[in-house]
C-alpha cells in the first residue's frame, strides 16, 4: 500500500460522460491566489512536494445539472474499474455512459495525473461499446478503445505504454529484474494497467493501482465506507 505522501493526485479529467460533453478537469494545483492576511487556510490546505504545490481539499461550484455530481461519479467509477479483476467487465461498464446527444459514437474519456515518488504520471483510457454485443447486459458489451500511460523519465515525459483496441502498440514500462509483462490481453475490457500490475508487484502500474485502490474512496460506489471515513475525520478535527 502506498504511503500518503508518496502519491498525490494532481488532476482528473472527463469527456463525453453523462451530462459532461466537453473536456472538464478537476485540478488540485494551487494557484497564486492568497487568502486574507493572517489566515491559516493556505498553510493548512496546501502541501508541497518536489516543487509542486497541491491542494488537500477542493470544492466544486456550478449551476444545477452542470455536471458536478457526474465528475465525482466518474472519479469514483474510474478508481473502481482499476480495483476490479481483469476478467470482470462490471468495473468498466458504469464508465460507458456517453453524453445523451452525442451521435458520433465517440467513447467516454477519463484521465488522471498523479505525482508518484516525485515523478509525474498521466494515465487514462477511453471506454466504448463493444463491436459485437451478443445481448443486453452481456459481460462483453463494453471495451477499452484506447489506453495510455506517460511518465517522467530523465526529466522528460515519455510514453510508457500505448494500447489501441485490444493490442498493446507500445510497451516501454520499466520492470523489476527478471520480470516480463506479456502484452496479450485476455479480454477487450481488460485494463492493461491492471494486467501489468499483476505481473510486477513492484512496478509503476502496481503503485498506481495501489493508490487508486486504497486512497480514493468514492461516495458513489462505497457509500458506507465513505460515510464512515468522513465521520471519523470530522470527529478527529473536532477533538483537535
Where are these regions (language model features)?
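Electropositive, glycine-dotted interaction segments
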Residues: 122-240
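Short loop/turn segments at secondary-structure transitions that flank enzyme active sites
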Residues: 18-20, 32, 84, 131, ...
Amino acid at each position: 500500500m502506498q504511503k500518503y505522501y508518496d502519491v498525490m493526485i494532481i488532476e482528473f479529467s472527463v469527456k463525453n460522460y453523462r451530462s459532461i460533453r466537453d473536456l472538464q478537469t478537476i485540478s488540485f494545483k494551487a494557484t497564486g491566489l492568497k487568502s486574507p492576511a493572517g489566515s491559516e487556510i493556505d498553510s493548512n490546505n496546501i502541501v508541497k512536494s518536489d516543487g509542486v504545490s497541491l491542494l488537500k481539499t477542493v470544492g466544486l461550484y456550478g449551476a444545477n445539472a452542470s455536471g458536478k455530481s457526474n465528475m465525482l461519479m466518474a472519479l469514483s467509477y474510474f478508481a473502481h474499474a482499476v480495483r476490479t479483476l481483469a476478467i470482470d467487465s462490471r468495473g468498466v461498464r458504469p464508465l460507458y455512459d456517453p453524453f445523451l446527444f452525442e451521435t458520433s459514437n465517440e467513447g467516454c474519456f477519463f484521465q488522471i495525473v498523479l505525482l508518484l515518488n516525485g515523478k509525474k504520471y498521466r494515465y487514462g483510457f477511453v471506454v466504448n461499446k463493444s463491436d459485437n454485443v451478443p445481448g443486453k447486459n452481456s459481460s462483453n458489451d463494453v471495451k477499452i478503445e484506447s489506453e495510455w500511460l506517460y511518465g517522467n523519465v530523465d526529466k522528460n515525459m515519455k510514453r510508457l505504454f500505448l494500447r489501441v483496441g485490444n493490442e498493446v502498440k507500445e510497451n516501454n514500462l520499466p520492470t523489476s529484474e527478471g520480470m516480463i509483462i506479456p502484452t496479450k490481453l485476455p479480454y477487450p475490457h481488460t485494463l492493461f494497467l491492471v494486467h501489468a500490475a499483476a505481473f510486477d508487484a513492484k512496478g509503476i502500474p502496481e503503485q498506481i493501482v495501489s493508490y487508486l485502490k486504497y486512497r480514493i474512496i468514492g461516495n458513489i460506489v462505497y457509500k458506507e465506507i465513505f460515510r464512515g471515513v468522513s465521520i471519523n475525520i470530522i470527529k478527529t478535527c473536532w477533538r483537535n
